[in-house]
Regions:
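Hydrophobic packing residues in well-ordered alpha-helices of helical domains and bundles
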Residues: 12, 31, 79-82
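Short, contiguous, well-structured surface segments enriched in hydrophobic/aromatic residues
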Residues: 25-69
Length: 172
C-alpha cells in the first residue's frame, strides 16, 4: 500500500476520531449530524462496483451489517429506522421524516445526552454517547472487513479519493 493510499484509509479512521471529539466538546447536534454523515460515507464506499451512487437500500444494508449496539441495550439498530432518523435529522433537523408518515412501523428517534437507549413501541430515545460509540465501532468493523476481504477492499479503494480530505496549511 502506498503512503497516499494509507493516508486515504487513515482519513476514515480520522472521521471516527473527529466524531468523538465533537461529542466530547459538548456539540451534541453537530455530533449527531456528523454521525449520520459518517454512516452515509461508509455506505457509499461499500457500494457494489457497478453502482456510482447510493440508495436507501445501500444505507440500510451497511447499518444492518456493521452498526451494532451493546447487547444489553434495549434497542438494537434496524436499517430502516436509522435511515428514517437520518433523513429526519439531515433534511429537517427533526425526529420525523416522510418514511415515518408513510409507515407507522418505522420507529421515531429522539435523542438524549446519556448512554442508554430507551425503547418504546413507536419511539426510541437514543443515547447519543452510545450512538457515537456504536458508529465508531461500526467504522472500525467496516475497516477490518476491508482489510480482510480483498473484493470489498477493491470496491472501496477507488472511491477513497472522493472522500473529503483536509490538509494542514502552514502560514508563511
Amino acid at each position: 500500500m502506498s503512503a497516499e493510499q494509507a493516508n486515504m484509509w487513515d482519513g476514515l479512521v480520522q472521521m471516527g476520531k473527529e466524531l468523538k471529539r465533537t461529542h466530547a466538546a459538548g456539540c451534541m447536534s453537530a455530533a449527531l449530524t456528523f454521525a449520520y454523515v459518517c454512516i452515509d460515507t461508509m455506505s457509499y464506499l461499500s457500494l457494489p462496483s457497478e453502482k456510482s451512487h447510493q440508495e436507501r437500500s445501500d444505507f440500510m444494508s451497511w447499518v444492518d451489517t456493521y452498526l451494532k449496539g451493546e447487547p444489553s441495550q434495549p434497542y438494537q439498530y434496524h436499517g430502516l429506522d436509522v435511515y428514517a432518523a437520518r433523513c429526519a435529522v439531515l433534511h429537517a433537523f427533526s425526529s420525523e421524516a416522510e418514511l415515518h408518515r408513510k409507515d407507522p412501523g418505522v420507529r421515531l428517534f429522539g435523542y438524549h445526552d446519556g448512554g442508554r437507549h430507551v425503547s418504546h413501541p413507536h419511539l426510541v430515545l437514543i443515547g447519543i454517547a452510545s450512538f457515537i460509540d456504536d458508529i465508531v465501532g461500526a467504522i472500525e468493523a467496516f475497516l477490518a472487513a476491508c482489510r480482510d476481504d480483498a473484493a470489498l477492499r477493491a470496491r472501496v479503494e477507488p472511491r477513497l479519493v472522493k472522500v473529503l480530505q483536509t490538509f494542514p496549511i502552514q502560514a508563511p
